[in-house]
């Protein structure tokens, strides 16, 4: 079996303007694997479909490297891609393009072998696949955000989820000091034993700006405080870790597993974050293992992209015991998010607030190509 085509299609949700790049890798025997990549869409598409431009092997082009290759050996393909595209794809948007292709290759390999993709990653080590639901409903005043969040919390509880994350962004909580009231209200409703995460969206750029708010947050026993600073503000993370008892999480701005090394070495985080649509399924494995060596957990990022990316995160989580929660954007809370709810089905199966072990071949979802054609942009 040989790979015969590698293509990337930009899709845009007409309701939200969100975009994803749908990557397809097809073979001469009629099998196709699909993946997603989330970054600057036109740049990602250009890199995925790139051909050789450098005879020295520094930038051989993703499409050129894959055409004619045997899709069966994923480790060899990933190593080949990383080694021969490093001029453009070592990190950033270039790596996101690799991530989309990598996801498609894992989907294809599972279909080729007739097994769920996670079985090709290793033995099951994670006994529980627990989603957390992120609550973000766009810009507005703090009072609007508070009302929307509390309504969504009721839905989360009604649907049986076991963990939740609230958002304090400049566009939905304009005054960061109101974050304390937001968290207090949610914690009062869900109780102390319900895991609660808080995402600050990198809104602070130094420790001094965060100190007063974070001091007040310690009382709420947060599962994690996500992204207080950009991931390169290591000194500020150290100061915050020393001043607060709240576990810290960061990293969804990063891409390749190697990008995370300074954060891992800083010994300030309880969790790192990365996801299949940006880090790639293969490099998620590398990141999870590197984090485990430091005693750090891994929280897969899953806000962007659709069911393909969600499924890929779940498959990777099966084989790592330091992934306690998986970000999830359920259709019930975001019915108008077409890329999330309709591009690929079925949704992962939930029972008692946990994902059931995937059993279908590949990533276990089917892409609606008719919808993809309708959502595609040039």
Regions found by a protein language model. Name each.
Residues 127-244:
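Metal-dependent enolase-superfamily TIM-barrel catalytic cores that perform enediolate-based chemistry
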Residues 26, 43, 215, 221, ...:
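Shared catalytic-loop signature of beta/alpha-barrel
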Residues 37, 133-135, 166-168, 198-202, ...:
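A cross-domain feature marking catalytic cores of carbohydrate-active enzymes
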Residues 102-142:
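Glycine-rich, aromatic-flanked loop segments that form ligand/cofactor-binding clefts
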Residues 3, 30, 101, 114, ...:
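Conserved, mostly hydrophobic/aromatic
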Residues 360-378:
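Extended hydrophobic packing segments that form well-structured cores
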Residues 26-112:
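Metal- or metallocofactor-binding catalytic centers and their adjacent structured scaffolds
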Residues 1-34, 38-45, 334-341:
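Structured beta-strand/loop patches that form or line metal/cofactor-binding pockets in enzymes
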């Amino acid at each position: 079996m040989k790979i015969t085509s590698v293509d990337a299609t930009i899709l845009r949700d007409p309701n939200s303007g969100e975009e994803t790049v749908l990557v397809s890798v097809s073979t001469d025997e009629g099998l196709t694997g699909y993946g997603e990549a989330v970054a600057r869409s036109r740049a990602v598409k250009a890199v995925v479909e790139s051909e050789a431009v450098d005879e020295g092997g520094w930038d051989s082009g993703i499409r050129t490297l894959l055409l004619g290759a045997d899709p069966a050996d994923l480790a060899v393909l990933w190593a080949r891609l990383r080694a021969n595209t490093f001029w453009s794809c070592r990190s950033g948007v270039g790596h996101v393009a690799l991530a989309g292709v990598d996801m498609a290759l894992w989907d294809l390999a599972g279909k080729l072998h007739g097994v769920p993709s996670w079985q090709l990653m290793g033995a099951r080590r994670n006994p529980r696949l627990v989603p957390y639901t992120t609550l973000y409903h766009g810009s507005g005043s703090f009072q609007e955000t508070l009302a929307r969040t509390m309504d969504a919390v009721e839905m989360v509880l009604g649907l049986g989820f076991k963990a939740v994350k609230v958002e304090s962004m400049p566009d939905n909580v304009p005054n960061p000091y109101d974050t304390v009231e937001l968290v207090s209200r949610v914690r009062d409703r869900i109780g102390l034993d319900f895991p609660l995460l808080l995402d600050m969206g990198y809104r602070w750029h130094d420790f001094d700006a965060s100190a007063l708010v974070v001091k007040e947050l310690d009382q709420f026993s947060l599962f994690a405080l996500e992204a207080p600073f950009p991931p390169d503000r290591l000194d500020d993370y150290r100061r915050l870790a020393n001043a607060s008892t709240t576990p810290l999480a960061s990293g969804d701005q990063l891409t390749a597993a190697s990008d995370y090394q300074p954060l891992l070495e800083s010994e300030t985080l309880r969790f790192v974050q990365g996801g299949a649509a940006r880090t790639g399924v293969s490099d998620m494995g590398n990141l999870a293992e590197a984090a485990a060596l430091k005693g750090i957990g891994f929280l897969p990022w899953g806000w962007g992209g659709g069911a393909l990316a969600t499924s890929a995160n779940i498959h990777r989580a099966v084989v790592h015991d330091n992934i306690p929660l998986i970000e999830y954007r359920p259709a019930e809370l975001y019915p108008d998010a077409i890329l999330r709810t309709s591009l690929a089905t079925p949704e992962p199966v939930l029972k008692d607030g946990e994902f059931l072990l995937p059993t279908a071949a590949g990533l276990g979802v089917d892409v609606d190509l008719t919808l993809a054609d309708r959502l595609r942009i040039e």
